[in-house]
């Protein structure tokens, strides 16, 4: 189980990035300067900037959270077993927020301070692992290739 410093994260903005080619997901807590720099980069260059500047600086630090391939199962489980890309914070931790990059292969979304506070409060009130255990087997088999015992353990292990 991943441990988070919710008080510190609550003061930051979160950025979600996903490279659909490898299907790996990351969350980063950005300060205002990080967000300002990211927004100043042209949209078509933001993903590369995120990889080269933000990820390079933050990966492995307390300001990063790797979700590996578990992000997809988490997304389904937070939606009760259904895929939900509606911009509904706090239950759409993965895709909710402002879209900064969206292509066929990559997506970056930004959660503002209030979104982060709402997510933190939601996770304090609702145990993510319990949500996953409750909803994992409700995921449609046709849409989720990891719906098996190993997929459940992987999703729980990264949550």
Feature names for model-found ranges:
Residues 2-158:
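Acidic (Asp/Glu-rich) sequence patches and key acidic residues
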């Amino acid at each position: 189980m991943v441990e988070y410093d919710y008080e510190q994260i609550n003061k930051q903005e979160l950025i979600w990035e996903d490279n659909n080619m490898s299907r790996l997901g990351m969350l980063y807590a950005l300060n205002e300067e990080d967000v300002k720099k990211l927004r100043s980069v042209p949209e078509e260059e933001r993903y590369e900037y995120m990889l080269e500047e933000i990820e390079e600086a933050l990966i492995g630090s307390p300001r990063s959270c790797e979700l590996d391939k578990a992000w997809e199962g988490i997304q389904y489980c937070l939606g009760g077993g259904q895929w939900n890309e509606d911009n509904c914070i706090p239950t759409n931790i993965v895709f909710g927020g402002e879209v900064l990059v969206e292509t066929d292969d990559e997506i970056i979304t930004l959660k503002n301070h209030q979104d982060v506070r709402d997510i933190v409060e939601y996770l304090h009130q609702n145990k993510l692992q319990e949500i996953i255990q409750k909803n994992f087997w409700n995921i449609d088999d046709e849409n989720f290739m990891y719906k098996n015992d190993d997929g459940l353990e992987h999703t729980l292990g990264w949550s």
